């Protein structure tokens, strides 16, 4: 879905890393969830609380969006790769949100400072913590471990109503029990 990410200059962390997975390409779609789990764990280790990883690639706190993960893959003559992008709102000023945010957005986003004022807010330290958390999870992912085992309790989908939308087919509704 062509959605835009908005955050004022200097108010967050936006990072990208290039991955060259050796695992079967059919499972590459799970890498955004793996990165989301790593990001959630890193933020929690740095003092943030109330952080939820929501399907398929969003980080929420207090029912508002804190950040997101984007994974795009490419096949080229030099090999296949995934560009993994992570964005986190760290310090958004309320007046800046009201003045500059696109219509209706200021009520739907939140920043790390608002959620956990004492949490680490240095973008460099947060980026390093994310990479340190991602490294072992990415290794498990490449070794073919089940996504549900890698994520553990990081994904906040269990017990929630979910919809499955398929082109040209009826929408399926159900209650999520986890991820396989």
Q: What is each PLM-predicted segment?
A:
Residues 23, 29, 33-50, 61-180:
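Long, positively charged amphipathic alpha-helical accessory segments at protein N-termini or as interdomain linkers
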């Amino acid at each position: 879905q062509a959605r835009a990410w908005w955050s004022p200059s200097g108010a967050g962390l936006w990072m990208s890393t290039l991955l060259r997975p050796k695992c079967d390409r059919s499972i590459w779609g799970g890498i955004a969830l793996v990165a989301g789990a790593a990001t959630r764990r890193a933020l929690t280790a740095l003092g943030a609380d109330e952080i939820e990883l929501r399907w398929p690639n969003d980080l929420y706190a207090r029912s508002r969006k804190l950040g997101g993960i984007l994974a795009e893959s490419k096949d080229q003559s030099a090999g296949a790769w995934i560009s993994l992008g992570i964005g986190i709102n760290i310090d958004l000023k309320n007046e800046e949100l009201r003045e500059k945010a696109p219509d209706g957005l200021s009520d739907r986003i939140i920043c790390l400072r608002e959620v956990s004022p004492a949490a680490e807010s240095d973008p460099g330290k947060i980026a390093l913590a994310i990479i340190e958390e991602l490294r072992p999870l990415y290794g498990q992912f490449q070794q073919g471990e089940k996504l549900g085992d890698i994520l553990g309790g990081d994904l906040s989908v269990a017990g929630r109503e979910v919809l499955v939308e398929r082109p040209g087919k009826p929408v399926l509704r159900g209650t999520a029990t986890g991820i396989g």
